[in-house]
Each structure stands twice: as structure tokens, then as C-alpha cells.
């Protein structure tokens, strides 16, 4: 029974941890700031920001994103676009926009991955702070002000990651991911910030201190997820990462099952690659928040394989004609379902209440309250089974290239 308790209550424990962390973060750090007023900053003392946009086959989105960044009213900005050997007409579109606008364009002829593209861009950055954006990102006007303000109070802050919102919500998958980001990912980021270490910045929207990125050796070109990899390099060098929910951007998410599956496998593989690379280095740090993050990843992987082994054992040894066995199994199933549903209701309600400050209409997502987090754990389990073997086979020293992403539709 104790073994079963671990299988059942590990997801429950993590959900409770995220709920408590989110509530505490909201009332101590978030609610006191107004969304309608940007931080009071003296323009003469304002730090400059270099905006880095790395793109590969982004002809459908690059014009909107580049136009948005050009229109930002942030007083001290520099824009660098890096085309990573696109095979479509992305480069031609950027050259056309450049005819009437002032920005730096780095046109790489060979696709060598996002990390390599960012490395090429940051080496040309003039300012001490670098904002990395994906090529489908639309940034709110006040977001850079909220993010840069954090660096004034913490000299060891290496990066501030923002609050990505979803633009394409017309499809069922788009709506579900909107609720996922609001209720699950937002909870996790808030809780991890309180604990002292955020597992990963958001690759779509993060402001870095340039000297910190240089100090850790830039982005890794051979890691499948450059954002997770650089996050842990920053942690291991003693830098902090902070989540800033007031700094919002708008992005596109996959709207096909194939695109979503490919994205989630890539995310999981990237996390596992970092786990395999940085485990022993993390153990030497004597930093408890990093221990929590590392063991959370390890236990999540072990949980998946143990669940599968346990279910396989039950199936092989089951006596389906035994009334006592069937009654016991059914009661366990009911207990599991009730416990997970009860915790899910609490987590969704709390998370969507907090998130309603940014998008009130997301409260309609309570329709998913009873089942989605359970599905989330099942999907993650399937993803781990595919991603972990891929991480074990990672080739060091090469280039982790990217393919054309599933951006869905562009409506907001």
C-alpha cells in the first residue's frame, strides 16, 4: 500500500506545492503592483536593451513580430535579427523591412540551430541587457520596463523571464493550451521563484544580463533546448532567475496533435539532457533550491517508469475472476480519481483566479477543471518514455538544429 501511495500522491503533492506557492507569490509579490502603470523610471538612467530575434522559416510571422518590436516605445533599444539559413523567403522579407527601418540583420547561410544564431547575435549587441524573443512573439508596450526594473535590486540576477500569453485560441488545442499556461505553467513558475530557483526561462521571452550569458559561455549549440540549458548554466554559476508575471507577451502555439507532440517531446528531451549533464555539478553546489529542482526531475522520470512497471505487474498477476481482487482494484481506482479531481478543482480555481488579473475570460476554462491536470500527467508520462532515450543518445559538440515550427493561426 505504501508503494501505491507514492504512485498516487506524488502528483497530488506536487499540485499542492504549486497551489501554496502560487498563492503566497501572488499576495506577497504580485498583487501590489498595478497593471496600468509602468515602473517609475528616469529615462536618463534607463538601461539600454538589445532585442535578439533568431528565426528559421518564419515567413508567416516575422513581419508582425519585427513590426511590433520596432514600434515599442522603450527609449533605449537596439534590434538584431538573425536568420538561421531559412529555406523559405524569411530573409527576403527582412531585407524589405530593413529598407525603411534601422536594425542589424545577420543573415546566416547555414542552419545551425537557435543557440548558434543567438550566439552570433549577442556578440554584436551594444547594450548590457539582451531580450531574446521568438519570431512569433508580440510584446506588450510596458513589458521591457517591468523586466529591466528587477535588475536594479539584485546584482546576481542573470535573467528575468516573462509571462507568455497565447494568441491563437480558436481551436480546441489552442484553448486547452491557454488554460494550461494559465493554470499549470504559471503556478509552477511562481512556486519555483519563491523556492529560489526557476527550472527554465521561457525561450520565447526573456531578458538576460549580457555579462552573465558571456560568463557562462553563451548558449550551448549541442543541446536541443537552449533555454533550459542556459538556465542551469546560470544557476550553477551563482546567478538567479526570476519570473515576472507583469511582463507579458503574446505567442502562437501548435494547433495540430503532431505539432504539439513534437514540441513536448523536445521540451522533455531538453530537460533530460540537462539532468544528465549537470547532475553531479548540481550536487556540488550545496544549494538546496537546486537540489529540489534536480530531484523533482529525477522523481518525475522514475514515477513514469515505476507506474508502467506496476501496472504491468498487476496485469500479469491479476485474477480477473477473483471478486475480492476486482473490488479492491475498483476501490483504488475510485480513490485515485476522487483525490486527483478534488486537487485539480482547487488548483484550477486558484490558478485561474490569479490569472484573471491578466485575462478575465480565461475563467471560462473551469470547464476543464476536473480532468485536464490528470490528462497533463498522462501526456507527460508518454512524453518521458520517448524523450529520455533520445536524451541518452545526445551527440556532444554538434549543432542542435531546428525545423519549421507549428505556429497555428495568428489571431489573438
Curated annotation (Swiss-Prot):
<dbReference type="InterPro" id="IPR029044">
    <property type="entry name" value="Nucleotide-diphossugar_trans"/>
</dbReference>
<keyword id="KW-0812">Transmembrane</keyword>
<dbReference type="GO" id="GO:0005886">
    <property type="term" value="C:plasma membrane"/>
</dbReference>
<keyword id="KW-0328">Glycosyltransferase</keyword>
<keyword id="KW-0808">Transferase</keyword>
<feature type="transmembrane region" description="Helical">
    <location>
        <begin position="366"/>
        <end position="388"/>
    </location>
</feature>
<dbReference type="Pfam" id="PF00535">
    <property type="entry name" value="Glycos_transf_2"/>
</dbReference>
<comment type="similarity">
    <text>Belongs to the glycosyltransferase 2 family.</text>
</comment>
<feature type="transmembrane region" description="Helical">
    <location>
        <begin position="332"/>
        <end position="354"/>
    </location>
</feature>
<protein>
    <recommendedName>
        <fullName>Poly-beta-1,6-N-acetyl-D-glucosamine synthase</fullName>
        <ecNumber>2.4.1.-</ecNumber>
    </recommendedName>
</protein>
<feature type="transmembrane region" description="Helical">
    <location>
        <begin position="6"/>
        <end position="28"/>
    </location>
</feature>
<dbReference type="GO" id="GO:0008375">
    <property type="term" value="F:acetylglucosaminyltransferase activity"/>
</dbReference>
<keyword id="KW-1003">Cell membrane</keyword>
<dbReference type="GO" id="GO:0043708">
    <property type="term" value="P:cell adhesion involved in biofilm formation"/>
</dbReference>
<dbReference type="InterPro" id="IPR001173">
    <property type="entry name" value="Glyco_trans_2-like"/>
</dbReference>
<keyword id="KW-0472">Membrane</keyword>
<feature type="transmembrane region" description="Helical">
    <location>
        <begin position="290"/>
        <end position="312"/>
    </location>
</feature>
<comment type="function">
    <text>N-acetylglucosaminyltransferase that catalyzes the polymerization of single monomer units of UDP-N-acetylglucosamine to produce the linear homomer poly-beta-1,6-N-acetyl-D-glucosamine (PNAG, also referred to as PIA), a biofilm adhesin polysaccharide. Requires IcaD for full activity.</text>
</comment>
<dbReference type="InterPro" id="IPR023853">
    <property type="entry name" value="PGA_PgaC/IcaA"/>
</dbReference>
<keyword id="KW-1133">Transmembrane helix</keyword>
Amino acid at each position: 500500500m505504501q508503494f501505491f501511495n507514492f504512485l498516487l500522491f506524488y502528483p497530488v503533492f506536487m499540485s499542492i506545492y504549486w497551489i501554496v506557492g502560487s498563492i503566497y507569490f501572488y499576495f506577497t509579490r504580485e498583487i501590489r503592483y498595478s497593471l496600468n502603470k509602468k515602473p517609475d523610471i528616469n529615462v536618463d538612467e534607463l538601461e539600454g536593451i538589445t532585442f535578439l530575434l533568431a528565426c528559421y522559416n518564419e515567413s508567416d510571422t516575422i513581419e508582425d513580430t519585427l513590426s511590433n518590436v520596432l514600434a515599442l516605445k522603450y527609449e533605449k533599444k537596439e534590434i538584431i535579427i538573425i536568420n538561421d539559413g531559412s529555406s523559405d523567403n524569411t530573409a527576403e522579407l527582412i531585407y524589405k523591412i530593413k529598407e525603411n527601418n534601422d536594425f542589424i540583420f545577420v543573415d546566416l547561410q547555414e542552419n545551425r540551430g537557435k543557440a548558434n544564431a543567438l550566439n552570433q547575435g549577442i556578440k554584436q549587441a551594444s547594450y548590457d541587457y539582451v531580450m531574446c524573443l521568438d519570431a512569433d512573439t508580440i510584446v506588450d508596450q510596458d513589458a521591457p520596463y517591468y523586466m529591466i526594473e528587477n535588475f536594479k535590486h539584485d546584482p546576481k540576477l542573470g535573467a528575468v523571464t516573462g509571462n507568455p500569453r497565447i494568441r491563437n485560441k480558436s481551436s480546441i488545442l489552442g484553448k486547452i493550451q491557454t488554460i494550461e499556461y494559465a493554470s499549470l505553467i504559471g503556478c509552477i513558475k511562481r512556486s519555483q521563484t519563491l523556492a529560489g530557483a526557476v527550472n527554465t526561462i521561457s525561450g520565447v521571452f526573456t531578458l538576460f544580463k549580457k555579462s552573465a550569458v558571456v560568463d557562462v559561455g553563451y548558449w550551448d549549440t549541442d543541446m536541443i533546448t537552449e533555454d533550459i540549458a542556459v538556465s542551469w548554466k546560470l544557476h550553477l554559476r551563482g546567478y538567479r532567475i526570476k519570473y515576472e508575471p507583469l511582463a507579458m507577451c503574446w505567442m502562437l502555439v501548435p494547433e495540430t496533435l503532431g505539432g504539439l507532440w513534437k514540441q513536448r517531446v523536445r521540451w522533455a528531451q531538453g530537460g533530460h539532457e540537462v539532468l544528465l549533464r549537470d547532475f553531479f555539478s548540481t550536487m556540488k553546489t550545496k544549494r538546496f533550491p537546486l537540489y529540489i529542482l534536480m530531484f523533482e526531475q529525477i522523481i518525475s522520470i522514475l514515477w513514469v517508469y515505476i507506474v508502467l512497471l506496476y501496472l504491468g505487474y498487476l496485469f500479469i498477476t491479476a485474477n480477473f475472476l477473483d471478486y475480492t481482487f476486482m473490488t479492491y482494484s475498483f476501490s483504488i481506482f475510485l480513490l485515485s480519481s476522487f483525490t486527483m479531481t478534488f486537487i485539480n478543482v482547487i488548483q484550477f480555481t486558484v490558478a485561474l483566479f490569479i490569472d484573471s488579473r491578466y485575462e478575465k475570460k480565461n475563467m471560462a476554462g473551469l470547464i476543464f477543471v476536473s480532468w485536464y491536470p490528470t490528462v497533463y500527467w498522462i501526456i507527460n508520462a508518454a512524453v518521458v518514455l520517448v524523450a529520455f532515450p533520445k536524451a541518452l543518445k545526445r551527440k556532444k559538440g554538434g549543432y542542435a538544429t531546428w525545423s519549421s515550427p507549428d505556429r497555428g493561426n495568428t489571431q489573438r
